[in-house]
């Protein structure tokens, strides 16, 4: 069973169909349910992932259906602005969705993984450290410590925790950028090409099937970082 957060985002929507070919998918969205997506092995669930109680209640409700779980923490949010201008509410929102939700989903799914003697935790991060994205970058840096801790504490149960760090990809989010910003991002990539969702799926498939890759961070950005 694959548990995917961020199912309504650009990358989430584009990888769901291929993920459903690997296993059944519990696709979690935070705001609006994706339209025109009907796949045999995918069920969509609305969960406010900034609310610890909602996450716990969701896992409790689905626990009887969960076995051999791969958790893919994809959900993320960014609020642009210089750090000195950030309100505490904005900071806490970014941290709760980008970092705390990863901890909470891991925390509540690990007992199931321990029982199964198998589990995969994949945190999706980013190489973005642009000016004006300080809270986003800080939250994603926090994933490094979280993933390392999980990898060391639960390896003996055949549970792995790894990070995939993404560069610029050919998704709806990229195409919403201005032509100037598109060029800025593309100029960072030596090949001048956008990443494809198949690159992400290859990494996910690799991590699901690799029991000795643990605590690692895999960068998929075409050499831009």
Residues covered by each model-derived region:
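Substrate-binding pocket helix/loop in short-chain dehydrogenase/reductase
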Residues: 82-83, 90-95, 174, 185
